[in-house]
A protein has these predicted regions:
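Extracytoplasmic/periplasmic beta-strand context in beta-sandwich domains
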Residues: 5-7, 91-92, 140, 148, ...
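Non-catalytic DNA-recognition/assembly elements of restriction-modification systems
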Residues: 6, 10-35, 149
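DNA target-recognition domains and sequence-specific DNA-contacting regions of bacterial/archaeal
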Residues: 26-154
């Protein structure tokens, strides 16, 4: 409902924000291709290599390197550009959360904007526009020009911030609930072990 504009925020003074504009992704973001890291992978490296496995697992599966070949900065959106037919990783995105920690691998792109990346990541990740490139038969490879043509709905910066703040708050609640659930599952596991010893 948010991106269909059925739910809208108001300005602090109670006024309506202006209508959203439709723009191409290339009008809002700078695009960068990643670089090959296969020859510099190091088990004890100090930088995280952002590859498709990293993004598709929300950052839990990691490879490391000691060479910062393509440095990423906080608020960069990284997106998977290649996947198997009917794969679940194509156009999946990850928001970079700190500087000097991540380096961008090939077949992953970096989308950088001066606008609110937290707002846009929810609109870009697994966008239907990108999913239509998957024909279910051969590997899907998104090209730079195709990515830059993706249509985006763009509210004014003040409304972007309100939306991003709301979504970030919800993400925080979800994170805390997952931690609570994990604690309950551990408690249950411990009780079951004690019951059947």
């Amino acid at each position: 409902k948010l991106f269909s504009q059925k739910v809208r925020f108001k300005a602090d003074d109670g006024d309506q924000f202006p209508e959203w504009e439709e723009k191409k992704l290339g009008e809002v973001f700078e695009f960068y291709n990643g670089k090959a890291h296969e020859n510099v992978i190091s088990e004890n490296g100090k930088y995280v290599v952002v590859n498709s496995k990293f993004i598709s697992t929300d950052g839990t599966v990691r490879k490391y390197t000691n060479e910062m070949i393509f440095p990423l900065i906080k608020k960069d959106i990284v997106m998977v550009m290649s996947d198997v037919p009917n794969g679940k990783a194509i156009s999946k995105c990850f928001l970079i959360n700190e500087n000097n920690k991540y380096t961008l691998n090939q077949r992953i792109c970096c989308l950088r904007t001066k606008e609110n990346a937290v707002f846009y990541i929810n609109q870009i990740s697994r966008n239907k526009y990108f999913l239509k490139f998957d024909d279910g038969v051969k590997q899907t490879n998104l090209r730079k020009n195709d990515i830059l043509q993706c249509p985006l709905l763009c509210p004014c910066l003040a409304e972007q911030q309100k939306i991003a703040d709301c979504l970030s708050s919800l993400d925080e609640v979800i994170k805390k609930q997952k931690a609570t659930l994990a604690a309950w599952e551990e408690l249950k596991k411990g009780l079951l072990q004690q019951m059947f010893v």
